[in-house]
Regions:
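Bacterial Sec-dependent N-terminal signal peptides
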Residues: 1-25
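Amphipathic alpha-helical repeat scaffolds of TPR domains
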Residues: 20-28, 51-73, 99-118, 144-159, ...
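N-terminal targeting signals for Sec/Tat export/insertion, comprising classic cleavable signal peptides
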Residues: 27-56
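Short coil/turn connectors between adjacent alpha-helices in alpha-solenoid helical repeat scaffolds
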Residues: 29-33, 70-82, 114-126, 158-168
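Canonical positions in the second alpha-helix
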Residues: 48, 93, 136-137, 176
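TPR/TPR-like (Sel1-like) alpha-helical repeat modules
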Residues: 81-88, 124-135, 145, 165-184
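A contiguous pocket-lining binding segment that forms or flanks enzyme active sites
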Residues: 122, 127-160
């Protein structure tokens, strides 16, 4: 009986230690990102992802950091490297967590980064994919504020490109803000971004 108890204590302690390492590592990576050190943050998220191969969350953040910091990048080589890494870790996350609307939104953001860099080259092939991704994500998670916001912002961008009125999509941005107020998930470090962006986009609706 004593041996069983000792084994149980060791197992529980090992799990707790691993969880502490994960939590501390993720917090440090977010700190680096907040300090405008995206490369260092990405590298740390990547090391955590390699240690947490059954957890899609750190893989998500490797992809997210590299995607966000690709917008506005003019150097094609740097952009390609970042977005290829983003896609690599997105695919790993999708293998762990298939049919995940958060990952669908992220995939659409990766596509949008390519389109923003060169719409003439990438717009025709990736715009249709984004439409499908957002429709699929919305069907699966209509109460997810990032899904609602990202779909609305994509449609607003498309409307602006073709010289159409963006007003019909402003109500969806407003809806996303309502959803942000109530949305929660118990998974540690689950994506929570978007509210500030929704407020910016909604203000633009009034201009």
């Amino acid at each position: 009986m004593k041996k069983i108890l000792v084994v149980l204590v060791i197992c529980v302690t090992s799990v707790a230690t691993a969880q502490d390492r994960y939590t501390n590592g993720m917090q440090k990576a977010f700190q680096l990102w907040g300090e405008q050190k995206p490369t260092e943050a990405s590298n740390l998220f990547e090391r955590i992802a390699m240690a947490e191969q059954d957890n899609w969350i750190p893989h998500y953040y490797v992809a997210h950091v590299n995607t966000i910091h690709s917008f506005g990048e003019k150097d094609f080589e740097k952009l390609s490297k970042q977005l290829e890494k983003a896609k690599e870790f997105l695919d790993l996350a999708k293998a762990i967590s298939p049919d995940n609307p958060e990952l669908m939104v992220l995939e659409a953001l990766i596509n949008t980064a390519w389109i923003a860099y060169d719409g003439a080259t990438y717009g025709m092939t990736l715009s249709g994919k984004n439409f499908q991704l957002y429709e699929q994500a919305l069907a699966m998670a209509p109460q997810n504020p990032r899904v609602v916001l990202s779909k609305a912002e994509w449609e607003m961008g498309s409307a602006k490109y073709f010289g159409k009125d963006v007003t019909p999509y402003c109500k969806d941005v407003e809806k996303s803000l309502e959803l942000f107020a109530n949305f929660s998930n118990d998974t540690p470090f689950y994506p929570s971004w978007g509210k500030d962006r929704a407020e910016v986009v909604l203000n633009q609706c009034g201009e």
